[in-house]
UniProtKB/Swiss-Prot annotation:
Residues 192-485 form the Protein kinase domain. On ligand binding, forms a receptor complex consisting of two type II and two type I transmembrane serine/threonine kinases. Type II receptors phosphorylate and activate type I receptors which autophosphorylate, then bind and activate SMAD transcriptional regulators. Receptor for activin A, activin B and inhibin A. Mediates induction of adipogenesis by GDF6. Belongs to the protein kinase superfamily. TKL Ser/Thr protein kinase family. TGFB receptor subfamily. Keywords: ATP-binding, Cell membrane, Disulfide bond, Glycoprotein, Kinase, Magnesium, Manganese, Membrane, Metal-binding, Nucleotide-binding, Receptor, Serine/threonine-protein kinase, Signal, Transferase, Transmembrane, Transmembrane helix. This is Activin receptor type-2A. Part of a complex consisting of MAGI2/ARIP1, ACVR2A, ACVR1B and SMAD3. Interacts with MAGI2/ARIP1. Interacts with type I receptor ACVR1. Interacts with BMP7. Interacts with TSC22D1/TSC-22. Interacts with activin A/INHBA.
Length: 513
Protein backbone atom coordinates (compact mmCIF):
# COMPACT_ATOMS: atom_id res chain seq x y z
CA UNK A 1 0.00 0.00 0.00
CA UNK A 2 2.93 2.37 0.63
CA UNK A 3 4.21 1.89 -2.93
CA UNK A 4 0.74 2.54 -4.36
CA UNK A 5 0.39 5.74 -2.34
CA UNK A 6 3.79 6.99 -3.55
CA UNK A 7 2.82 6.21 -7.14
CA UNK A 8 -0.49 8.13 -6.87
CA UNK A 9 1.20 11.10 -5.22
CA UNK A 10 3.87 11.24 -7.95
CA UNK A 11 1.20 11.20 -10.67
CA UNK A 12 -0.62 14.03 -8.88
CA UNK A 13 2.57 16.16 -8.63
CA UNK A 14 3.36 15.65 -12.31
CA UNK A 15 -0.15 16.62 -13.38
CA UNK A 16 -0.06 19.80 -11.26
CA UNK A 17 3.37 20.92 -12.47
CA UNK A 18 2.98 20.10 -16.16
CA UNK A 19 1.23 23.41 -16.84
CA UNK A 20 4.13 25.36 -15.36
CA UNK A 21 6.73 23.35 -17.33
CA UNK A 22 5.10 23.85 -20.70
CA UNK A 23 5.86 27.17 -22.41
CA UNK A 24 3.22 29.26 -24.03
CA UNK A 25 3.30 31.13 -27.31
CA UNK A 26 3.12 34.91 -27.05
CA UNK A 27 0.42 36.65 -29.05
CA UNK A 28 1.59 39.84 -30.74
CA UNK A 29 -0.77 40.16 -33.73
CA UNK A 30 -4.22 38.85 -34.67
CA UNK A 31 -6.36 38.86 -37.77
CA UNK A 32 -8.87 41.73 -37.45
CA UNK A 33 -12.38 41.82 -38.92
CA UNK A 34 -15.50 43.76 -37.93
CA UNK A 35 -18.78 43.15 -39.75
CA UNK A 36 -20.17 46.31 -38.14
CA UNK A 37 -17.19 48.46 -39.19
CA UNK A 38 -19.35 51.33 -40.44
CA UNK A 39 -21.33 51.63 -37.18
CA UNK A 40 -18.24 51.21 -34.96
CA UNK A 41 -16.10 53.53 -37.15
CA UNK A 42 -13.25 51.01 -37.53
CA UNK A 43 -11.43 49.36 -40.39
CA UNK A 44 -13.22 46.36 -41.84
CA UNK A 45 -10.28 43.97 -42.15
CA UNK A 46 -6.59 43.93 -41.37
CA UNK A 47 -4.06 42.89 -38.75
CA UNK A 48 -4.43 44.12 -35.15
CA UNK A 49 -1.44 44.55 -32.83
CA UNK A 50 -2.26 43.30 -29.34
CA UNK A 51 -1.29 45.47 -26.36
CA UNK A 52 -1.75 44.82 -22.66
CA UNK A 53 -0.05 44.64 -19.28
CA UNK A 54 3.13 42.59 -19.31
CA UNK A 55 1.80 40.28 -16.59
CA UNK A 56 -1.41 39.57 -18.52
CA UNK A 57 -1.76 37.11 -21.40
CA UNK A 58 -2.95 38.15 -24.86
CA UNK A 59 -5.05 36.03 -27.18
CA UNK A 60 -6.81 36.14 -30.54
CA UNK A 61 -10.54 35.49 -30.98
CA UNK A 62 -13.08 34.88 -33.70
CA UNK A 63 -16.89 34.94 -33.70
CA UNK A 64 -19.07 33.69 -36.50
CA UNK A 65 -22.55 32.53 -37.46
CA UNK A 66 -23.57 29.38 -39.28
CA UNK A 67 -26.59 30.26 -41.40
CA UNK A 68 -27.84 27.13 -43.17
CA UNK A 69 -24.31 25.89 -43.68
CA UNK A 70 -22.97 29.30 -44.78
CA UNK A 71 -20.29 30.76 -42.48
CA UNK A 72 -20.64 34.50 -41.73
CA UNK A 73 -17.80 36.10 -39.72
CA UNK A 74 -18.92 38.62 -37.07
CA UNK A 75 -15.65 39.79 -35.46
CA UNK A 76 -11.98 38.83 -35.20
CA UNK A 77 -9.24 40.52 -33.21
CA UNK A 78 -7.28 40.63 -29.96
CA UNK A 79 -8.65 39.22 -26.68
CA UNK A 80 -7.15 40.02 -23.27
CA UNK A 81 -6.27 37.53 -20.53
CA UNK A 82 -9.05 34.93 -20.52
CA UNK A 83 -8.28 31.69 -18.67
CA UNK A 84 -10.49 29.80 -21.12
CA UNK A 85 -8.01 30.65 -23.89
CA UNK A 86 -4.83 29.52 -22.10
CA UNK A 87 -2.50 27.19 -24.07
CA UNK A 88 -4.90 26.85 -27.01
CA UNK A 89 -2.90 27.00 -30.24
CA UNK A 90 -5.96 26.45 -32.46
CA UNK A 91 -9.18 28.48 -32.50
CA UNK A 92 -11.79 25.76 -31.93
CA UNK A 93 -15.34 26.02 -30.58
CA UNK A 94 -16.61 22.85 -28.90
CA UNK A 95 -20.02 24.00 -27.71
CA UNK A 96 -23.04 24.16 -29.96
CA UNK A 97 -24.67 27.59 -30.27
CA UNK A 98 -27.98 28.53 -31.91
CA UNK A 99 -26.71 32.08 -32.60
CA UNK A 100 -23.01 32.97 -32.55
CA UNK A 101 -19.96 30.71 -32.23
CA UNK A 102 -16.87 31.92 -30.32
CA UNK A 103 -13.33 30.62 -30.06
CA UNK A 104 -10.02 31.98 -28.78
CA UNK A 105 -6.40 30.91 -28.97
CA UNK A 106 -2.78 31.89 -28.25
CA UNK A 107 -0.18 32.60 -30.91
CA UNK A 108 0.32 35.11 -33.69
CA UNK A 109 -2.56 35.14 -36.22
CA UNK A 110 -3.97 31.94 -34.69
CA UNK A 111 -7.51 33.16 -35.39
CA UNK A 112 -6.96 33.12 -39.15
CA UNK A 113 -8.50 29.65 -39.17
CA UNK A 114 -11.34 28.68 -36.87
CA UNK A 115 -13.51 25.60 -36.59
CA UNK A 116 -16.27 23.91 -34.65
CA UNK A 117 -15.77 20.40 -33.25
CA UNK A 118 -18.57 19.36 -30.89
CA UNK A 119 -17.58 17.39 -27.83
CA UNK A 120 -18.42 13.74 -28.25
CA UNK A 121 -20.75 12.28 -25.67
CA UNK A 122 -19.25 9.31 -23.91
CA UNK A 123 -21.58 6.34 -24.22
CA UNK A 124 -21.80 3.94 -21.36
CA UNK A 125 -20.49 0.48 -22.30
CA UNK A 126 -22.85 -2.44 -22.06
CA UNK A 127 -22.48 -4.50 -18.95
CA UNK A 128 -20.23 -7.51 -19.18
CA UNK A 129 -20.25 -10.54 -16.95
CA UNK A 130 -18.38 -9.76 -13.77
CA UNK A 131 -15.14 -11.61 -13.57
CA UNK A 132 -13.71 -12.31 -10.18
CA UNK A 133 -10.89 -9.91 -9.13
CA UNK A 134 -7.89 -11.03 -7.18
CA UNK A 135 -7.71 -9.88 -3.55
CA UNK A 136 -4.77 -7.47 -4.12
CA UNK A 137 -6.90 -5.51 -6.65
CA UNK A 138 -9.40 -4.56 -3.92
CA UNK A 139 -6.58 -3.49 -1.62
CA UNK A 140 -5.07 -1.24 -4.31
CA UNK A 141 -8.51 0.19 -5.19
CA UNK A 142 -9.39 1.09 -1.61
CA UNK A 143 -5.93 2.69 -1.16
CA UNK A 144 -5.98 4.83 -4.30
CA UNK A 145 -9.57 6.13 -4.18
CA UNK A 146 -9.09 8.41 -1.11
CA UNK A 147 -5.79 9.71 -2.52
CA UNK A 148 -7.34 10.47 -5.90
CA UNK A 149 -10.27 12.25 -4.24
CA UNK A 150 -7.87 14.44 -2.26
CA UNK A 151 -5.85 15.16 -5.40
CA UNK A 152 -9.03 16.08 -7.28
CA UNK A 153 -10.12 18.49 -4.55
CA UNK A 154 -6.69 20.17 -4.52
CA UNK A 155 -6.66 20.53 -8.33
CA UNK A 156 -10.18 21.98 -8.35
CA UNK A 157 -9.32 24.45 -5.59
CA UNK A 158 -6.18 25.52 -7.46
CA UNK A 159 -8.15 26.01 -10.70
CA UNK A 160 -10.82 28.11 -8.95
CA UNK A 161 -8.10 30.23 -7.31
CA UNK A 162 -6.37 30.93 -10.65
CA UNK A 163 -9.67 31.60 -12.35
CA UNK A 164 -10.72 34.23 -9.83
CA UNK A 165 -7.29 35.78 -9.62
CA UNK A 166 -6.52 36.11 -13.34
CA UNK A 167 -9.80 36.31 -15.17
CA UNK A 168 -11.17 39.82 -15.71
CA UNK A 169 -14.23 40.42 -13.54
CA UNK A 170 -17.57 40.59 -15.36
CA UNK A 171 -18.61 43.77 -13.52
CA UNK A 172 -16.39 46.37 -11.94
CA UNK A 173 -18.10 48.55 -9.36
CA UNK A 174 -16.05 51.11 -7.42
CA UNK A 175 -16.92 52.69 -4.14
CA UNK A 176 -18.56 56.09 -4.22
CA UNK A 177 -15.95 57.16 -1.66
CA UNK A 178 -12.54 55.45 -1.85
CA UNK A 179 -12.21 55.68 1.94
CA UNK A 180 -13.48 53.37 4.67
CA UNK A 181 -17.26 53.44 3.89
CA UNK A 182 -18.67 50.26 2.32
CA UNK A 183 -19.03 50.03 -1.47
CA UNK A 184 -22.08 51.44 -3.23
CA UNK A 185 -24.77 49.04 -4.51
CA UNK A 186 -24.22 47.39 -7.86
CA UNK A 187 -24.95 49.79 -10.70
CA UNK A 188 -26.59 46.88 -12.49
CA UNK A 189 -29.33 46.93 -9.85
CA UNK A 190 -30.16 50.59 -10.55
CA UNK A 191 -32.25 51.67 -13.56
CA UNK A 192 -29.88 53.32 -16.05
CA UNK A 193 -31.56 54.70 -19.18
CA UNK A 194 -29.61 55.98 -22.20
CA UNK A 195 -31.18 59.20 -23.53
CA UNK A 196 -29.10 60.71 -26.36
CA UNK A 197 -25.64 60.59 -27.92
CA UNK A 198 -23.64 63.69 -26.97
CA UNK A 199 -20.26 62.95 -28.58
CA UNK A 200 -18.28 60.41 -30.58
CA UNK A 201 -14.56 59.85 -30.31
CA UNK A 202 -11.68 57.51 -31.02
CA UNK A 203 -12.68 55.02 -28.31
CA UNK A 204 -16.47 55.04 -28.59
CA UNK A 205 -19.40 57.36 -27.95
CA UNK A 206 -20.70 59.32 -24.95
CA UNK A 207 -24.39 59.19 -23.99
CA UNK A 208 -26.43 61.38 -21.73
CA UNK A 209 -28.25 58.95 -19.43
CA UNK A 210 -30.52 58.95 -16.40
CA UNK A 211 -29.57 57.07 -13.23
CA UNK A 212 -32.50 57.22 -10.80
CA UNK A 213 -33.26 60.96 -10.52
CA UNK A 214 -29.98 62.39 -11.86
CA UNK A 215 -28.30 62.73 -15.22
CA UNK A 216 -25.01 60.92 -15.81
CA UNK A 217 -22.65 60.46 -18.74
CA UNK A 218 -22.10 56.94 -20.10
CA UNK A 219 -19.04 56.38 -22.26
CA UNK A 220 -19.51 53.16 -24.27
CA UNK A 221 -16.46 51.32 -25.61
CA UNK A 222 -16.61 48.43 -28.11
CA UNK A 223 -14.90 45.25 -26.91
CA UNK A 224 -11.83 45.84 -29.10
CA UNK A 225 -11.10 48.98 -27.05
CA UNK A 226 -11.11 47.07 -23.77
CA UNK A 227 -7.57 48.27 -22.99
CA UNK A 228 -8.63 51.94 -23.04
CA UNK A 229 -11.70 51.21 -20.88
CA UNK A 230 -9.61 49.22 -18.42
CA UNK A 231 -6.97 51.97 -18.28
CA UNK A 232 -9.58 54.65 -17.51
CA UNK A 233 -11.11 52.46 -14.80
CA UNK A 234 -7.72 51.82 -13.19
CA UNK A 235 -6.79 55.52 -13.20
CA UNK A 236 -10.14 56.58 -11.72
CA UNK A 237 -9.76 53.84 -9.06
CA UNK A 238 -6.40 55.14 -7.81
CA UNK A 239 -6.28 56.67 -4.31
CA UNK A 240 -7.07 60.37 -4.14
CA UNK A 241 -8.74 60.72 -7.54
CA UNK A 242 -11.71 62.66 -6.14
CA UNK A 243 -10.95 66.28 -6.98
CA UNK A 244 -13.08 69.26 -8.02
CA UNK A 245 -11.15 69.64 -11.26
CA UNK A 246 -11.13 65.97 -12.28
CA UNK A 247 -14.27 64.45 -13.77
CA UNK A 248 -16.26 62.57 -11.08
CA UNK A 249 -16.25 58.79 -11.62
CA UNK A 250 -19.38 56.79 -10.74
CA UNK A 251 -18.82 53.23 -11.97
CA UNK A 252 -17.90 50.79 -14.74
CA UNK A 253 -19.78 47.82 -16.18
CA UNK A 254 -19.83 45.22 -18.90
CA UNK A 255 -23.11 45.04 -20.80
CA UNK A 256 -24.30 42.47 -23.33
CA UNK A 257 -23.68 38.81 -24.10
CA UNK A 258 -20.35 37.02 -23.94
CA UNK A 259 -19.76 37.80 -27.61
CA UNK A 260 -21.43 41.15 -28.27
CA UNK A 261 -20.13 43.00 -25.20
CA UNK A 262 -20.08 46.76 -24.66
CA UNK A 263 -17.93 48.29 -21.94
CA UNK A 264 -19.52 51.15 -20.00
CA UNK A 265 -17.86 53.91 -18.00
CA UNK A 266 -20.28 56.05 -15.97
CA UNK A 267 -19.29 59.57 -14.85
CA UNK A 268 -20.89 62.86 -13.84
CA UNK A 269 -22.72 64.69 -16.64
CA UNK A 270 -22.01 68.34 -17.46
CA UNK A 271 -24.54 70.03 -19.74
CA UNK A 272 -22.12 72.64 -21.08
CA UNK A 273 -19.98 69.86 -22.55
CA UNK A 274 -16.36 70.29 -23.57
CA UNK A 275 -14.37 73.52 -23.65
CA UNK A 276 -14.04 73.10 -27.41
CA UNK A 277 -17.81 72.95 -27.91
CA UNK A 278 -18.34 75.90 -25.56
CA UNK A 279 -15.82 78.13 -27.37
CA UNK A 280 -17.40 77.35 -30.74
CA UNK A 281 -20.66 78.89 -29.58
CA UNK A 282 -19.50 81.50 -27.04
CA UNK A 283 -16.93 84.19 -26.41
CA UNK A 284 -15.50 84.65 -22.90
CA UNK A 285 -14.79 87.67 -20.74
CA UNK A 286 -11.42 88.17 -19.03
CA UNK A 287 -12.75 86.91 -15.68
CA UNK A 288 -14.34 83.86 -17.34
CA UNK A 289 -11.07 83.10 -19.14
CA UNK A 290 -9.13 83.32 -15.89
CA UNK A 291 -11.59 81.05 -14.04
CA UNK A 292 -11.57 78.38 -16.75
CA UNK A 293 -7.78 78.51 -17.20
CA UNK A 294 -7.02 78.49 -13.46
CA UNK A 295 -9.30 75.53 -12.66
CA UNK A 296 -7.98 73.60 -15.67
CA UNK A 297 -4.39 74.22 -14.53
CA UNK A 298 -5.22 73.16 -10.97
CA UNK A 299 -6.79 69.94 -12.22
CA UNK A 300 -3.73 69.09 -14.31
CA UNK A 301 -1.38 70.07 -11.47
CA UNK A 302 -3.22 67.70 -9.11
CA UNK A 303 -3.07 64.94 -11.73
CA UNK A 304 0.70 65.43 -12.11
CA UNK A 305 1.34 65.49 -8.36
CA UNK A 306 2.67 62.52 -6.40
CA UNK A 307 0.82 62.54 -3.05
CA UNK A 308 1.80 59.98 -0.37
CA UNK A 309 0.01 59.50 2.92
CA UNK A 310 -3.62 59.85 1.85
CA UNK A 311 -6.17 57.99 3.99
CA UNK A 312 -6.84 55.55 1.15
CA UNK A 313 -3.23 55.15 -0.01
CA UNK A 314 -0.58 56.75 -2.19
CA UNK A 315 -1.69 58.78 -5.22
CA UNK A 316 0.99 58.47 -7.92
CA UNK A 317 1.87 61.12 -10.48
CA UNK A 318 -0.22 60.68 -13.64
CA UNK A 319 0.47 61.90 -17.17
CA UNK A 320 -2.71 62.48 -19.22
CA UNK A 321 -1.11 62.20 -22.71
CA UNK A 322 -4.16 63.56 -24.55
CA UNK A 323 -4.73 67.07 -23.18
CA UNK A 324 -6.94 69.06 -25.57
CA UNK A 325 -10.00 71.30 -25.36
CA UNK A 326 -12.25 68.30 -26.13
CA UNK A 327 -11.02 66.60 -22.95
CA UNK A 328 -11.67 69.59 -20.68
CA UNK A 329 -15.30 69.68 -19.51
CA UNK A 330 -17.11 72.70 -18.08
CA UNK A 331 -19.48 72.71 -15.12
CA UNK A 332 -22.42 75.12 -14.99
CA UNK A 333 -20.29 77.77 -13.25
CA UNK A 334 -17.53 77.35 -15.90
CA UNK A 335 -15.27 75.42 -13.53
CA UNK A 336 -13.10 73.12 -15.64
CA UNK A 337 -12.50 69.42 -14.98
CA UNK A 338 -10.09 67.07 -16.77
CA UNK A 339 -11.61 64.00 -18.46
CA UNK A 340 -10.70 60.99 -20.65
CA UNK A 341 -7.87 58.92 -19.16
CA UNK A 342 -7.77 56.21 -21.84
CA UNK A 343 -4.12 57.00 -22.66
CA UNK A 344 -2.99 58.11 -19.19
CA UNK A 345 0.18 56.75 -17.56
CA UNK A 346 0.62 56.38 -13.81
CA UNK A 347 4.09 56.49 -12.27
CA UNK A 348 4.21 54.30 -9.17
CA UNK A 349 7.45 53.85 -7.24
CA UNK A 350 9.18 50.60 -8.13
CA UNK A 351 6.74 49.77 -10.93
CA UNK A 352 6.96 50.10 -14.67
CA UNK A 353 4.67 52.70 -16.24
CA UNK A 354 3.46 49.97 -18.62
CA UNK A 355 3.58 49.95 -22.41
CA UNK A 356 4.63 53.51 -23.26
CA UNK A 357 4.06 53.97 -26.96
CA UNK A 358 5.55 57.35 -27.82
CA UNK A 359 3.32 58.78 -30.54
CA UNK A 360 -0.10 58.71 -28.92
CA UNK A 361 -2.66 61.44 -28.51
CA UNK A 362 -4.15 63.92 -30.97
CA UNK A 363 -1.76 65.02 -33.74
CA UNK A 364 -2.35 68.76 -33.61
CA UNK A 365 -1.65 68.78 -29.84
CA UNK A 366 1.54 66.66 -30.04
CA UNK A 367 4.69 68.24 -28.62
CA UNK A 368 7.77 68.55 -30.89
CA UNK A 369 9.56 65.69 -29.13
CA UNK A 370 6.54 63.43 -29.68
CA UNK A 371 6.36 64.33 -33.38
CA UNK A 372 10.10 63.64 -33.70
CA UNK A 373 9.84 60.33 -31.84
CA UNK A 374 12.56 61.58 -29.50
CA UNK A 375 10.85 61.08 -26.15
CA UNK A 376 12.78 60.51 -22.95
CA UNK A 377 10.65 57.80 -21.33
CA UNK A 378 10.85 59.31 -17.85
CA UNK A 379 8.06 60.74 -15.72
CA UNK A 380 9.03 64.40 -16.08
CA UNK A 381 9.24 64.12 -19.87
CA UNK A 382 5.64 62.91 -20.08
CA UNK A 383 4.40 65.66 -17.75
CA UNK A 384 6.08 68.30 -19.94
CA UNK A 385 4.32 66.88 -23.00
CA UNK A 386 1.03 67.62 -21.21
CA UNK A 387 2.19 71.20 -20.60
CA UNK A 388 2.85 71.82 -24.31
CA UNK A 389 -0.73 70.76 -25.08
CA UNK A 390 -2.02 72.95 -22.26
CA UNK A 391 -0.35 75.96 -23.89
CA UNK A 392 -2.40 75.29 -27.04
CA UNK A 393 -5.63 75.07 -25.01
CA UNK A 394 -4.81 78.41 -23.35
CA UNK A 395 -4.34 79.88 -26.84
CA UNK A 396 -7.83 78.63 -27.78
CA UNK A 397 -9.22 80.48 -24.76
CA UNK A 398 -7.29 83.66 -25.62
CA UNK A 399 -8.57 83.59 -29.21
CA UNK A 400 -12.18 83.82 -27.98
CA UNK A 401 -11.67 86.42 -25.24
CA UNK A 402 -13.28 89.87 -25.45
CA UNK A 403 -10.79 91.58 -23.13
CA UNK A 404 -8.46 93.02 -25.79
CA UNK A 405 -9.40 96.09 -27.83
CA UNK A 406 -9.80 94.31 -31.15
CA UNK A 407 -11.92 91.80 -33.06
CA UNK A 408 -12.57 88.37 -31.55
CA UNK A 409 -11.57 85.61 -33.95
CA UNK A 410 -13.91 82.87 -35.05
CA UNK A 411 -13.15 79.70 -33.13
CA UNK A 412 -10.36 77.65 -34.68
CA UNK A 413 -8.38 74.68 -33.46
CA UNK A 414 -4.63 75.11 -32.89
CA UNK A 415 -2.78 75.20 -36.25
CA UNK A 416 -6.08 75.14 -38.18
CA UNK A 417 -5.14 78.47 -39.77
CA UNK A 418 -1.73 77.10 -40.79
CA UNK A 419 -2.56 73.50 -41.81
CA UNK A 420 -6.33 73.05 -41.89
CA UNK A 421 -8.73 70.74 -40.08
CA UNK A 422 -7.18 67.35 -40.89
CA UNK A 423 -3.39 67.58 -40.64
CA UNK A 424 -1.22 64.54 -41.29
CA UNK A 425 1.68 63.58 -39.05
CA UNK A 426 4.05 64.86 -41.74
CA UNK A 427 2.22 68.23 -41.82
CA UNK A 428 2.61 68.62 -38.07
CA UNK A 429 6.29 67.63 -38.18
CA UNK A 430 7.00 70.21 -40.88
CA UNK A 431 5.23 73.09 -39.11
CA UNK A 432 6.01 72.36 -35.43
CA UNK A 433 9.40 70.62 -35.55
CA UNK A 434 11.18 71.98 -38.62
CA UNK A 435 9.67 75.49 -38.93
CA UNK A 436 9.06 75.78 -35.16
CA UNK A 437 5.79 77.60 -35.74
CA UNK A 438 3.06 78.08 -33.15
CA UNK A 439 -0.48 79.51 -33.41
CA UNK A 440 -0.52 83.30 -33.91
CA UNK A 441 -0.65 85.57 -30.84
CA UNK A 442 -2.42 88.73 -32.11
CA UNK A 443 -0.60 92.05 -31.66
CA UNK A 444 -3.59 93.76 -30.09
CA UNK A 445 -3.72 91.12 -27.33
CA UNK A 446 -0.51 92.67 -25.99
CA UNK A 447 -2.32 95.97 -25.35
CA UNK A 448 -4.35 94.41 -22.53
CA UNK A 449 -2.27 93.95 -19.38
CA UNK A 450 -3.70 90.56 -18.48
CA UNK A 451 -3.67 89.22 -22.06
CA UNK A 452 -0.02 90.28 -22.42
CA UNK A 453 0.87 88.21 -19.33
CA UNK A 454 -1.21 85.31 -20.62
CA UNK A 455 0.62 85.38 -23.98
CA UNK A 456 3.96 85.17 -22.16
CA UNK A 457 2.69 82.21 -20.12
CA UNK A 458 1.42 80.46 -23.27
CA UNK A 459 4.82 80.86 -24.97
CA UNK A 460 6.56 79.35 -21.94
CA UNK A 461 4.17 76.38 -21.98
CA UNK A 462 4.75 75.50 -25.64
CA UNK A 463 8.51 76.19 -25.62
CA UNK A 464 10.40 73.98 -28.08
CA UNK A 465 12.79 73.05 -25.25
CA UNK A 466 10.74 70.70 -23.08
CA UNK A 467 12.80 71.40 -19.94
CA UNK A 468 12.04 75.13 -20.24
CA UNK A 469 8.27 74.66 -19.99
CA UNK A 470 6.26 75.77 -16.99
CA UNK A 471 4.65 73.30 -14.61
CA UNK A 472 0.85 73.16 -14.27
CA UNK A 473 1.09 74.45 -10.70
CA UNK A 474 3.10 77.48 -11.84
CA UNK A 475 0.52 78.23 -14.57
CA UNK A 476 -2.28 78.15 -12.00
CA UNK A 477 -0.41 80.58 -9.73
CA UNK A 478 0.34 82.93 -12.62
CA UNK A 479 -3.28 83.09 -13.74
CA UNK A 480 -4.40 83.85 -10.17
CA UNK A 481 -1.87 86.68 -10.07
CA UNK A 482 -2.96 87.97 -13.50
CA UNK A 483 -6.60 88.16 -12.47
CA UNK A 484 -5.78 89.85 -9.16
CA UNK A 485 -3.58 92.38 -10.93
CA UNK A 486 -6.00 93.28 -13.71
CA UNK A 487 -8.96 93.52 -11.32
CA UNK A 488 -7.35 96.43 -9.47
CA UNK A 489 -6.47 98.30 -12.66
CA UNK A 490 -8.93 100.99 -13.70
CA UNK A 491 -9.18 102.94 -16.93
CA UNK A 492 -7.45 105.93 -15.30
CA UNK A 493 -4.46 103.75 -14.44
CA UNK A 494 -3.71 102.87 -18.05
CA UNK A 495 -0.41 104.78 -18.00
CA UNK A 496 0.67 102.95 -14.88
CA UNK A 497 -0.19 99.59 -16.41
CA UNK A 498 2.81 99.57 -18.73
CA UNK A 499 5.18 99.96 -15.79
CA UNK A 500 3.36 97.34 -13.74
CA UNK A 501 3.46 94.78 -16.54
CA UNK A 502 7.17 95.15 -17.13
CA UNK A 503 7.99 95.00 -13.41
CA UNK A 504 5.59 92.26 -12.34
CA UNK A 505 7.20 89.38 -10.47
CA UNK A 506 5.89 86.14 -11.90
CA UNK A 507 6.06 82.93 -9.89
CA UNK A 508 9.40 81.19 -10.55
CA UNK A 509 9.57 79.50 -13.93
CA UNK A 510 11.37 76.41 -12.67
CA UNK A 511 9.23 73.36 -13.21
CA UNK A 512 8.07 71.50 -10.15
CA UNK A 513 7.78 68.33 -12.22
Amino acid sequence: MGAAAKLAFAVFLISCSSGAILGRSETQECIFYNANWERDRTNRTGVESCYGDKDKRRHCFATWKNISGSIEIVKQGCWLDDINCYDRTDCIEKKDSPEVYFCCCEGNMCNERFSYFPEMEVTQPTSNPVTPKPPYYNILLYSLVPLMLIAGIVICAFWVYRHHKMAYPPVLVPTQDPGPPPPSPLLGLKPLQLLEVKARGRFGCVWKAQLLNEYVAVKIFPIQDKQSWQNEYEVYSLPGMKHENILQFIGAEKRGTSVDVDLWLITAFHEKGSLSDFLKANVVSWNELCHIAETMARGLAYLHEDIPGLKDGHKPAISHRDIKSKNVLLKNNLTACIADFGLALKFEAGKSAGDTHGQVGTRRYMAPEVLEGAINFQRDAFLRIDMYAMGLVLWELASRCTAADGPVDEYMLPFEEEIGQHPSLEDMQEVVVHKKKRPVLRDYWQKHAGMAMLCETIEECWDHDAEARLSAGCVGERITQMQRLTNIITTEDIVTVVTMVTNVDFPPKESSL
